[in-house]
């Protein structure tokens, strides 16, 4: 029995550990360190219809407990991803989750329609929550009606299940999650980065050229846990949880909150082996906590009927 196997819409995962989009590129750099086939899946870098060069530099700043980034969805564009990056990933035994972005709804629809045809793309992740772009991005993720409409339009053209990435920079994340579920989403991924800023002590100006950036890393984990806990009780579609995950213990905490799988982001920059390390350590942690299978942990913080052996 594979104690870590997880079944989600469109995704049969040998384990629930997925490198998060934007922190793993298309996997080429990390493939120099280990066989990517050990992973549950990969959320590839956001893809837009046309190439994007991203925001001006500097666009990364360290903070206590994390980092700020304002990359601006830099990517080689749909054609390059379809003709080069996705074919390269076919050598690995794992389903790919393609992250889809755009400036307007038509962009999302165009990318989703084409990229969902790739043989190794088993699901889409709609990036409606990036805080670092002037148009699109978070603009789609802060209004329930707009988020639902975009979800519905993408579902109509996608050949694979659609997951929607939620922004924490909202007043009521549950309301948005329910609207997206009602529009036909197959799952949710959450949370994206929190909007933040750092100032230079000598100039008193923002360190990032974009002024603001997305905060990620351990600092945001309590926020992510709280939001997963709230949303998982309000919807009936699976959640891939993310936000500050660094250890096997972090993974279990997200499962307790209600996640069915997790994505590891910023920690990949600190330790390129973090994902395989977590995968290796999870079975012993399940033994320690008294669980036969990781699915027994899902929603344990609020499911009264969930008990360890």
Curated annotation (Swiss-Prot):
Which EC number applies? 1.3.1.14
List keywords of the entry alphabetically. Answer: Cytoplasm, Flavoprotein, FMN, NAD, Oxidoreductase, Pyrimidine biosynthesis
Q: Which cofactor does it need?
A: FMN
The primary location reported for this protein is cytoplasm
The enzyme class is: oxidoreductase
Sequence intervals crossing the membrane: none
The positions annotated for binding FMN are: 21, 45-46, 99, 127, 165, 191, 217, 243-244, 265-266
One molecular function GO term is: dihydroorotate dehydrogenase (NAD+) activity
Q: How is the cofactor bound?
A: Binds 1 FMN per subunit.
InterPro entries, per the entry: Aldolase_TIM (IPR013785), DHO_dehydrogenase (IPR050074), DHOD_1B (IPR033888), Dihydroorotate_DH_1 (IPR024920), Dihydroorotate_DH_1_2 (IPR012135), Dihydroorotate_DH_cat (IPR005720), Dihydroorotate_DH_CS (IPR001295), Dihydroorotate_DH_I (IPR049622)
Report the protein name in the record.
Answer: Dihydroorotate dehydrogenase B (NAD(+)), catalytic subunit
Q: Which organism is it from?
A: Bacillus anthracis
């Amino acid at each position: 029995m594979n104690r870590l196997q997880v079944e989600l819409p469109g995704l049969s995962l040998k384990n629930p550990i997925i490198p998060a989009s934007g922190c793993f590129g298309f996997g080429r750099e990390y493939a120099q360190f280990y066989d990517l086939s050990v992973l549950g899946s990969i959320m590839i870098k956001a893809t837009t219809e046309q190439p994007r060069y991203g925001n001006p530099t500097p666009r990364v700043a360290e903070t206590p407990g994390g980092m700020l980034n304002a990359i601006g969805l830099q990517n080689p564009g749909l054609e390059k991803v379809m003709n080069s990056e996705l074919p390269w990933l076919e050598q690995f035994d794992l389903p790919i989750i393609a992250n889809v972005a755009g400036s307007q709804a038509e962009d999302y629809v165009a990318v989703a329609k084409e990229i969902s045809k790739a043989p190794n793309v088993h699901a889409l992740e709609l990036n409606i929550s990036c805080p670092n772009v002037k148009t699109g991005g978070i603009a789609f993720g802060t209004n329930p009606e707009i988020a639902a409409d975009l979800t519905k339009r993408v579902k109509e053209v996608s050949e694979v299940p659609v997951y929607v990435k939620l922004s924490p920079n909202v007043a009521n994340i549950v309301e948005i999650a329910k609207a997206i579920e009602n529009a036909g989403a197959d799952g949710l991924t959450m949370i994206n980065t929190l909007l933040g800023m750092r100032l230079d002590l000598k100039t008193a100006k923002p360190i990032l050229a974009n002024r603001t950036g997305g905060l990620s890393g351990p600092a945001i984990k309590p926020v992510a846990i709280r939001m997963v806990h709230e949303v998982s009780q309000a919807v009936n579609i699976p959640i891939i949880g993310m936000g500050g995950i660094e250890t096997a213990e972090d993974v279990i905490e997200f499962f307790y909150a209600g996640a069915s799988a997790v994505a590891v982001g910023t920690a990949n920059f600190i330790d390129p082996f973090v994902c395989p390390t977590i995968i290796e350590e999870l079975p012993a942690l399940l033994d320690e906590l008294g669980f036969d299978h990781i699915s027994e942990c899902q929603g344990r913080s609020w499911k009264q009927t969930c008990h360890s052996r």
